[in-house]
Each structure stands twice: as C-alpha cells, then as structure tokens.
Amino acid sequence: MTFLAIDVGNTRLKWALFDAAQPGAGLLAHGAEFLDHIERLAEGPWSHLPAPRHMLGCVVAGDAVKRRVAEQMELWDVPARWVVPSAQEAGVINGYDHPTRLGADRWVAMIGARHRLLAQGPARPLIVVMVGTAVTVEALDAEGRFLGGLILPGHGIMLRALESGTAGLHVPTGEVRLFPSNTSDALTSGGTYAIAGAVERMYQHLRQHCGQEPACMMTGGAGWKMAPSMTRPFELVENLIFDGLLEIAARRFAELPA
C-alpha cells in the first residue's frame, strides 16, 4: 500500500513516496519543488511514480496551495487529505489555547519527534526545533503534552529585515564567530545565536517545569547551520514532518475499509 506524504512549507513543497503508510516504511522516491512550480509535478517527477494508495499532507501556505496540489493529484485519482491539528492525536496532547490554530507543520513534527523519542527509550520531556523560513521551538512534557512553543524569524528573514530597516547594511555571507570582528560575521553570528538562545531558554523552562533533563530534536532545511552553535545535546533529524505523517497515516488509514 504505497503512501504519498507531502509537506508544504512557506517556500517549497517536499514530497516522499513510501512503500507503506506506517513508521519505518521504505522510501521509494522523494523530491521538492518551489511553490511557484507546483504545476510541474504531474507531468514531471510524479509522472513516473506508481499511484499511491493514500496521501496525507500538511500545509502552512493556505487553501490555494491545497487546491493546486489536488489538481496535480488528479493524475492518480487519489484524494488529497490534509492534517488539521486537533486536541489529541497519535498520543500527543495539544495544549494550544485554540488547538486548530496551531500550525499543522508544528503539530505533525511534534508527533514525529515524540514517537521517535519513545522508540529510543523511556519517555522524557522533549524540545522540538524546526529551522526554516521561520523557526519554531516546541516543548512537550514526558506524557506527550504540548505545553507551548516559540516562533521567531529564520536566518533569511532576520538578515533581510536588517537590510531593509538599517541604512548602509547589506546582506553578505558571513561566518559564525565567537567574537565577530566584521559586519558580515556579526550579522550571521547574531542570527545564529538568537536562535540558539531561544532554544536554550525553552530548554531551561522545560527542565524547571518537569524536573528532568529534556531531549532535543532539530529538523528543517537550515538545521545543519545551527548544529555547531547549540549548547545542549540534540539529534538532527532529516524530516520530522514525514515521520509524523507516517505515524498519523498508520492510525487513520488502518481505520478505512480496504
């Protein structure tokens, strides 16, 4: 039973075809397209794929993108199904004031991270960091309850904001330094340490709240940039959203008639 997982972010659509809708399924194919190029999927990379039995995705870019993806999926006559955050799913409890207003990507990544943690050993508090166009830092207790999270700009947004709002500053490529001694390095280091500082602060909050050292998982296209600057042990995971979609799909599609 092949399964298509789709993660639509702020700038790109990422997809992966698995040989089953369950955790640990084998990866058959994967790819990514910028949102402006979604219409290429059916006649391009998807044209050579076997028809998936089911599809499940998460999207932060709005209903218009959902419609565009659904049009591409007419290639297979497979309905497009999307995750909507709820009060509880796959063993994770949603502590947001209004659960359905939580970003679907955040919700799915937390589910993926929680089950990845449980597969490694006993339950413990967990910090989940996604580093992309925006950065999110989530806190879950040992029972799988989402307590709350932070949202802050990613590297690119920070640098563009400084460029547009500050006279004479342009956005060159710099390095992360302990003591930056030029503008390029100062900009890059400032953004990196801002993100690392947010993670550290949430780590301290969660440790104090739970009385236990949290685990930390990081994902997202720019996660590798943060690795050398992190002060706590962490696991860098290629795509927690796909992990979460597999967990959710295993439960949802098992309930559907064959």
UniProtKB/Swiss-Prot annotation:
Highest taxon listed in the record's lineage: Bacteria
GO biological process: coenzyme A biosynthetic process
Annotated EC: 2.7.1.33
GO cellular component: cytoplasm
Catalytic activity: (R)-pantothenate + ATP = (R)-4'-phosphopantothenate + ADP + H(+)
Subcellular location: Cytoplasm
Binding positions (substrate): 96, 103-106, 183
PANTHER family assigned to the protein according to its UniProt record, in alphabetical order: TYPE III PANTOTHENATE KINASE
The protein's role, per its UniProt record: Catalyzes the phosphorylation of pantothenate (Pan), the first step in CoA biosynthesis.
Listed NCBIfam families: baf (TIGR00671)
Protein name: Type III pantothenate kinase
Species for this entry: Acidovorax ebreus (strain TPSY)
Gene: coaX
